[in-house]
Structures are given as structure tokens and as C-alpha cells.
Amino acid sequence: EILTREGHSVVLVEKNKKLASVATREFHEWVHTGSLYTLVKDQMKTLKYILGSLDDLLEFYSSFKNMNLSPSEKGLQIDQNKNGWFNKNYIDFKYRLKNRKFLLNWVYSVSRSIALIEGIRKHDWLRRRAGIIESVTSEYYLPILKNFFKILFTNEKFLKIESTDFTTNSRLLLRDLLSTSIKNGLEVLTENELVKVENKGNEVIAHCKKGDLIGKKLAICVGGGVEKFTSIKIKKSLAPIAVVKNVPPETKSFVELDYFKKTCINIITKGSSYGMIGGISLSERKDAEKYFDYMIEEHKKSNPKLEVLEKYIGVKNEIISRGENRNYIFHINKEENKNIWSIIPGKFTLAFSIAPEFYRIIYNKNPRKFFDTNHEENQESLVDETVWGEVQNKLG
């Protein structure tokens, strides 16, 4: 979309019958605001990337009428409406404390996480970009200390807070982007797999199953399939997920967080008694069934009527550096071939930074911030439904 808004001629090649039919179809539609990554030990790198992406969302996507997120002096505001990109479905964080207080590093991590989330909640988005947030500064010392002693003296199994994370209507968002792109001249070619890429003079040739395409520049956005066309090595993580029903209407979306990651679970509510449950990522497929059993059993302890409609394993593709187990950020890599780039998107929320950053890399300037948009319902046929939406539609 960001290329077409600038008047460039763009062709989108998709090997499947519909767009967005893999990762964004499978996962929770969880919009990260940095809350979850207050627990990640990476010098706040992921947290800053996430917050920077929200800055870019506000700066480069506010022309879309259904982009219903706005800045305020104290946090981000969501204007709830039926066609809005985002929902006031805020996600509760439940930090496990029972039998964990002897793990003082966990107690500190929780104390720090809660203080940072409160900082995100109170951030003045009107006057300061959030992506420039510094590491833990003196203003956080006292809140962290207070949280630390509060945790030590509580008898609760979990310490619960409402995070700043919320959910998205990903299909509405993607259809708006696609509709505007098509209005600006985008050509979409589905069921047409990329086979090989090469340079010829100043041109790039994309050899596809339905014929060759010739252009000036090429972005390869094929997830784990990028290994076929580049020297990049991808680490795949497996996420057991289930679509469930009989979720009481008063149930809030939540994630249970623990020092021992294997016990983490979550649920994202989808309305009309539907929800999605999951929690962790695995390295080995053989471990998935054991975790399915565990997370379903844990959810049924509080909701015995919970019914599992479908189980599946989502795949996450990441570029991992030495010493890392996970890497959540996006990567834009210049290939040896002239005018060819490969892109690994990272978290869905980071899409709003990938696009403007890619444009800056290619054209050495920022994309425009104000432009005409388009909303056409008939783009529904080009964008695949989510797994949970498909299950819901089948059941009526």
C-alpha cells in the first residue's frame, strides 16, 4: 500500500488462492504495545521497536477512516466502531506468584514489568514519540521498589493488571489497505508462485509459475520460504492454538505469565462465546500434544463448559542471532542481486514500521502522511478469513 500511495506501479504475487492465508490467518490478532516485552531481557530493544511501530501507525496511517486509534496526553485511545481496525479488548496480565517468591529475579522482573506498563499507559503521545523511550530511569526506581514489596507480601496466586495491549480486526484492516492499493493501481496475481529471481541489466525478473514478471525492484515477502531465494537462515517456532466456544461474555482476554514458560497460557476472546487459546512456542512438533492437553485442562478448571472446536499449530518464522532463543523484530535485508530485498515481518504490530522503513531505504525519504483512502466491501473475496472466523461461520 505504501508504494502505491506514492504512485509507484506495483504487482503483488501470491501463491495461494487468497491473501493473508497463513500467519495472520492463524494467530490471535493481538496488538502489542510493548507490555509483553517488558519481561524480555534484550535491553528493551523489542519494546522500543513495538512502540516505534505505534508511532508510525499514528503518523502514516491516520488518513484511513477506520484507523480508530488516536494519541492522548495519557496513552492511546480507541474509538470503538463496527468497522474500526482496533477493539477495546484489553488483555489482562496475570503474573504467577504462588511458589515463585523465592525466585527474586522473577519478583524483580514482574515489579519492573508492571512499572514499565504503567509508564506506557501514561505516555504523552501528543508531545513525544514512544519509540524513543529510554531504559529504566530514576523515575521507575520507586514504583519498582513498591511493586517488589507488594509482591512479597501478597498471598494471591497471581498478581493481575490490565495491560495496554488490545486486539485488532485484522481482516477489516487488511481489506482497507488492499482496497486503497487497488484504487491506486495495484495488480494482484493469486495462485501464482514465485520460482526464481534474477537480474538482467537494470531490471529484475521474477520467474513465476504463470509466467515471468519484469520490474525495477523486488521485495520477497514469503516468510519461511525466503531461504529458497536468499542466504538467510530462518528459525521456525511452533505455536499450539485452539479455537473454543462457550466462553462467558464477562470473560476478559488474559495471559498467565510465569518464570517457567511451559506453564504460560492465554485466551483472546472473540465475542459470541468464541475465543482462541494458546500460550507458548515450541521447537519440536512432538511436544505440541502435551501442551494442548495442558492448556485445555487449565482453561477448563475455571470454565468446565469450554468446548474445543479446532486445534492447529501456527508457525512463526524468525531470524535468530547468536545467543538468542527468539527474535520478535522485523528484518529488511538487501540481497546480493541488484534491487532485490527480502523481508521478515516479525510481530504483526511491526507492519506499520516495516512499510515506511522499507520506503525510506529504497527512496531516501519519508512516504506521504495524508492521502485519499478507499473502502470496498468486495475486497473480502481476496483476503482469507481467520481460522477462528472460518470456524464461527461454519457453525453459523
Question: Which stretches of residues belong to each language-model region?
Answer:
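Active-site substrate-recognition segment that forms the wall
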Residues: 1-2, 29-31, 67, 217-339, ...
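Helix-loop-beta segment of a Rossmann-like dinucleotide-binding subdomain
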Residues: 71-97, 139-184, 280-282, 337-345
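Short amphipathic C-terminal alpha-helix that caps PH/PH-like domains
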Residues: 106-120, 291-302, 355-362
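Helical element adjacent to the flavin cofactor pocket in flavoenzyme catalytic cores
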Residues: 157-217, 221-222, 352-361
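C-terminal catalytic lobe of FAD-dependent flavoproteins
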Residues: 305-396
